A protein has these predicted regions:
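Solvent-exposed beta-strand/loop surfaces of large extracellular or lumenal domains
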Residues: 94, 205-218, 281-295, 447-455
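Short amphipathic beta-strand/extended segments with alternating polar/hydrophobic composition
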Residues: 50-57, 79-84, 120-121, 160-163, ...
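Non-catalytic terminal regions with compositionally biased, polar/charged low complexity
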Residues: 302-313, 319-455
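Short, hydrophobic/aromatic-enriched beta-strand segments in well-ordered soluble domains
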Residues: 193-195, 261-266, 275-290, 313-324
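Catalytic and substrate-binding regions of extracellular carbohydrate-active enzymes
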Residues: 2-218, 309-311, 317-325, 334-341
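Acidic, glycine-rich loop-and-strand cores that form catalytic or ligand-binding grooves
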Residues: 1-25, 29, 257-285
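Short, hydrophobic/proline-enriched secondary-structure or compact coil segments at domain edges
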Residues: 146-149, 247-249, 344-353
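Polysaccharide-binding surfaces and accessory modules of carbohydrate-active proteins
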Residues: 194-271
Length: 455
């Protein structure tokens, strides 16, 4: 049908015999638009309880200099938002200097100089792997993940971001964010991890709750030979620490069911952490029925600065949305050491949940490296082993060939994604390629299948 027909023919008449569409018929767990360098993963469509990650680089029109930027959804809101476009839209100085630049996004800025042309931009990320497959119409999975790569042009830095959603219950779940960054030719000065969250209060402490003794600082500024966007940050406080840290961002809700985003981050040598305020989140100010006056509230901002490279000392974070009436399920997050016979960027995470489940995660920058942490051995970009007293188990092999625990071993001759779950006395699996599962003295040769099916 030609577009001109809407104006030259008779008025358009809607056939009321055609039933209204259901949005669930058009949504998949993973959505990828390479023409816009935009990747979305979700674990459901419940407005209050589902989680969603939106990642984007810069491909096409109306794009920003943001590297691998991400937004997180939780408890009905875009809790971790991009900044927007400023008070005077695309023509304003605040857009040119801040809103279109790295520090206004949830990303990593290298040496304080990362930037490139905005509006019409041609700086896409490369999708290395994801599960479920983009556009695949399957049930929402208990674990999803993605891995993307980006070459930051100004600093000539390689950046890799691995993100995951882990569903732990009908109303609970958490995000995993592993961001690796290093300059191609070395000479790294620092890598700055920016994270912005909705809310009015922010509490940054060591992971055990002890004070970091944050002190006022002017370190994040244009005077540090950084892009001018840094000077838009204010009320800055910092501490140099190698400790694991925890940050709570809180929205004070009118009904007093306050919403929080809880963030745990792995510590590292030569690291500083900052609490700060950024200009208001203009992008949220146009959304009706927000819980507070967005234009009147500066944006809560966390920055982690890694001196030197941040590839073998990556930024590793776990995020969990919660509220007063729906508290989080995580009691603690630790980051155990990972053993490997090959040098590389190997990450271990242990998430202890209040109801007894323990999730163990290993991630590597090379899926061919054999990595071991505790009783878990993997060859994979990302692997998870969740166990609740043996009667509620989950095993996920992401972009790898081996996941081995004391009672279960998953292996494949080719790099694959495998989901194996045990619940209510039934084993189910899904796999993107042929694989083997060994457990209880038996060996199962499994064929590929996208939906969870009985073993």
């Amino acid at each position: 049908m030609a577009v001109t027909s809407f104006f030259s023919d008779k008025p358009l008449v809607i056939d009321d015999k055609i039933p209204a569409g259901d949005i669930n018929d058009y949504v998949t767990p993973t959505f990828y638009a390479p023409n816009a360098s935009w990747l979305v993963q979700r674990n459901g469509m419940d407005k209050r309880h589902s989680l969603m990650i939106a990642q984007n680089a810069s491909e096409g029109n109306h794009m920003h200099a943001n590297g691998i930027s991400m937004e997180l959804y939780g408890k009905g809101y875009r809790l971790a938002p991009d900044g927007g476009i400023g008070l005077t839209l695309y023509s304003g100085l605040d857009y040119l200097e801040y809103y279109s630049q790295f520090p206004a996004h949830n990303t990593v800025c290298v040496d304080g100089i990362s930037s490139y042309p905005v509006m019409k931009s041609n700086h896409a990320f490369k999708l290395l792997n994801c599960y479920p497959e983009a556009g695949m119409k399957v049930d929402y999975q208990p674990v999803s993940y993605s891995e993307v790569f980006f070459r930051e042009p100004e600093s000539q830095a390689d950046q890799n971001r691995m993100m995951s959603i882990v569903t732990t219950g009908e109303k609970n779940g958490y995000y995993v964010d592993i961001f690796r960054s290093r300059k191609v030719e070395g000479g790294d000065k620092m890598h700055d991890y920016f994270y912005h969250n909705m809310g009015q209060t922010m509490n940054l402490t060591a992971a055990d709750g002890s004070s970091l003794f944050l002190q006022p600082t002017e370190e994040l500024a244009f005077a540090g030979a950084h892009i001018y966007a840094y000077s838009y940050l204010f009320d800055k406080k910092s501490a140099e620490t190698s400790k694991d840290i925890k940050t709570m961002f809180t929205i004070q809700m009118p009904d007093e069911d306050n919403i929080s985003m809880n963030m745990w981050m792995k510590g590292a040598p030569e690291r500083k952490v900052f609490s700060a305020l950024s200009p208001m989140t203009e992008g949220l100010s146009r959304i009706p029925d927000m819980p507070y006056a967005i234009k009147e509230q500066p944006t809560l901002t966390f920055v982690a600065r890694q001196q030197g490279e941040a590839w073998n000392r990556p930024f590793v974070a776990v995020y969990e949305p919660s509220s007063v009436k729906e508290p989080g399920c995580i009691s603690s997050v630790t980051f155990p050491e990972v053993e490997s016979g090959v040098a590389g960027s190997h990450v271990g995470i242990c998430i202890q949940q209040k109801e007894g489940r323990v999730d163990r995660i290993i991630s590597s920058d090379d899926a061919g490296h054999l990595c071991k942490s505790g009783e878990m051995t993997v060859q994979a970009a990302y692997a998870l082993w969740g166990n609740k007293q043996g009667d509620d188990c989950i095993f996920f092999l992401g972009g790898g060939t081996l996941l081995k625990t004391p009672h279960v071993e998953i292996s494949s001759l080719t790099v694959t994604d495998v989901m194996l779950v045990y619940k209510e006395g039934v084993w189910k699996y899904a796999a993107s390629a042929p694989c083997k599962v060994r457990m209880n003295g038996k060996e199962y040769n499994l064929l590929p299948g996208h939906d969870l099916r009985k073993l």
